[in-house]
Amino acid sequence: EAESSFHDATGAGRGYACAGGVAEAIEKCINEYYPDVEVSIEHAEGLAECKKTLTLAKAGRLNGCLIEGMGCPGGCIAGAGTNIPVLKAKKDLAAYVKNSTTPIPPKELEEIELE
């Protein structure tokens, strides 16, 4: 059963492993459910970019931005534990995202009881 639940993930959720994927998922939901809300996103890849982005945020230069930071350039799909080339991982992930039957989660999420 856990396997089938895994495959039912939304397209937005499936894209989390790629740099920019978390922010993109949030932006898609906001655009769908709150179209009048403007979304400003700043994302950083790699520790140096993350540090720079956090410094800018601390200085007040990114006020109102949704900030996403991925420690590995390219995101988790390009991390130290990966065993396939990054371009193949991106291509495979894009296909996995596209094949989701649900692009984004419903506006009203149902409660899930954990055992």
Report the location of each language-model feature.
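Iron-sulfur-associated redox domains of electron-transfer enzymes in respiratory
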Residues: 1-115
